[in-house]
Amino acid sequence: MQKRIVSSLYFQVLLAITLGVILGHIYPDLGADMKPLGDGFVKLIKMIIAPVIFCTVVTGIAGMESMKAVGKTGAIALLYFEVVSTIALIIGLCVVNLLQPGAGMNVDPATLDASAISAYAEQAKAQGIIPFLLDVIPGSVIGAFASGNILQVLLFAVLFGFSLHHIGEKGKVIFNVIDSFSQVIFGIINMIMRLAPVGAFGAMAFTIGKYGIGSLVQLGQLIACFYMTCLLFIFLVLGSIARANGFSILRFISYIREELLIVLGTSSSESVLPRMLVKMEALGCKKSVVGLVIPTGYSFNLDGTSIYLTMAAIFIAQATNTPLDLFQQITLLVVLLISSKGAAGVTGSGFIVLAATISAVGHLPLAGLALILGIDRFMSEARALTNLIGNGVATLVVARYCDQLNEQQMHEALSNPPQVVKLDQH
């Protein structure tokens, strides 16, 4: 029993995170030097994400009996994403107005060092609904895979899957080749995931070493407010959605606990995308639903990022004594409904979207971003964890409404203690 616990990924990642915090606190410089370990692990995962999505989506769509089912799945998923993301934005707005974590700081925007956020501001200029939609279409198929753009790969995979389904028996050989290739890819993921504790250790040691636990105290009210709101959203909103669809949010969280720990260590929900594809299938969701909902959710269903965006924007207004009336806050909400869809599940993307939103709204001082630049990294964990849980719940809900969920299999998987899920495609 003790040997099984020690050898489990859950225990190893938890131990690695703890050691990372200790090293970063006691030896800050050495902790900051551990950054390549975390970056290297995330890059290894990113290396494999594009082929994983392609194989999963193509085999899922091509293997379906009816193409109408794919259209229905996509429509229900997008509707769900929009409704739940809007709820997340509204909850963030309500809590930050109620608790007012930035009130009383009386910061003069003119005294803030805006040079630190210049790089983010430049990236933010490229944000917008038209550029975002055009960016979904790759300049070339090879370019989509080379850049690792999830939505571009997803678009090509959907079209490829439709075409493969359309040619019927003629495409059987190609289908089998892609299916076999996916087994090789998931074998590679098995090898990479053994390095998860190393990646989590490096990322956590860097975070504590560079920013220090002391930096949490200065703006701790905003961090505490944000974490509390994320917990409120997970257990109240997602918990209610889960209960309405026949499962417990607590049991689901327990089911994906290894993935949650990896995300906690790396601050990137993208780092467990391949594992989530397999785990959601093992939970009873059809491959076609999982292949569409999970990757799409990484751009369109970022609940944690939505909460962060509203809270951070209003916090800046409160801290700099910038008055925002109800109409201006509603305008901010509408802009965020669009801009939040451009945030990918990687560390730092939420901050870029925040910069884009503040630039677009015009009511808030862009220099105010410097206030939260130092603590943004500490809030990225809660963002990523909330995003991951939200996408998992979304997959189960969409699968259920599309009659693509084996509910008996789901209840059995959630009732039993989480087992090690082998990453293959059998």
Swiss-Prot record:
Transmembrane intervals: 5-25, 44-64, 76-96, 142-162, 184-206, 222-242, 307-327, 330-350, 352-372
GO molecular function, one term: fumarate transmembrane transporter activity
GO BP, sorted A to Z: L-aspartate transmembrane transport
Organism superkingdom: Bacteria
Swiss-Prot/TrEMBL keywords: Cell inner membrane, Cell membrane, Membrane, Symport, Transmembrane, Transmembrane helix, Transport
Main location (coarse class): membrane
Localisation: Cell inner membrane
Record-annotated disulphide pairs: none
Cross-referenced Pfam families: SDF
Coiled-coil stretches: none
Gene3D superfamilies the UniProt entry points to: Sodium:dicarboxylate symporter
Membrane protein topology class: Multi-pass membrane protein
GO CC annotation terms, alphabetical: plasma membrane
Purpose of the protein: Responsible for the transport of dicarboxylates such as succinate, fumarate, and malate from the periplasm across the membrane.
Protein family (similarity comment): Belongs to the dicarboxylate/amino acid:cation symporter (DAACS) (TC 2.A.23) family.
HAMAP family: C4_dicarb_transport (MF_01300)
Protein name: C4-dicarboxylate transport protein
UniProt organism field: Aeromonas hydrophila subsp. hydrophila (strain ATCC 7966 / DSM 30187 / BCRC 13018 / CCUG 14551 / JCM 1027 / KCTC 2358 / NCIMB 9240 / NCTC 8049)
